């Protein structure tokens, strides 16, 4: 299995007020805290699943 060091850059674009607690925990797990905060993570299936779960809150920058 080859290791690719591809990264995904995320930005939190919507507020967490009024969202489910599990979605808030997922956003925290992605390393995002405040609106417009940016986090760069490894591109893994687990991270992709987390992004899909909170896709209405985050934007993939690159």
From Swiss-Prot:
Keywords of this entry: Ribonucleoprotein, Ribosomal protein
InterPro entries assigned: Ribo_uL30_ferredoxin-like_sf, Ribosomal_uL30_bac-type, Ribosomal_uL30_ferredoxin-like
Keyword Aminoacyl-tRNA synthetase in record: no
Superkingdom of the organism of origin: Bacteria
GO MF term list: structural constituent of ribosome
GO CC aspect terms: cytosolic large ribosomal subunit
Coiled-coil positions: none
GO BP terms, alphabetized: translation
Gene3D superfamilies: Ribosomal protein L30, ferredoxin-like fold domain
Ribonucleoprotein in keyword set: yes
Subunit structure: Part of the 50S ribosomal subunit.
Family: Belongs to the universal ribosomal protein uL30 family.
UniProt protein name: Large ribosomal subunit protein uL30
Organism the protein comes from: Polynucleobacter asymbioticus (strain DSM 18221 / CIP 109841 / QLW-P1DMWA-1) (Polynucleobacter necessarius subsp. asymbioticus)
Gene that encodes the chain: rpmD
């Amino acid at each position: 299995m080859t290791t690719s060091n591809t990264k995904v850059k995320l930005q939190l674009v919507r507020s967490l007020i009024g969202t489910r607690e599990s979605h808030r925990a997922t956003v925290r797990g992605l390393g995002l805290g405040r609106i417009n905060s940016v986090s760069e993570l490894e591109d893994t299936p687990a991270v992709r699943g987390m992004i899909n779960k909170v896709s209405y809150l985050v934007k993939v920058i690159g």
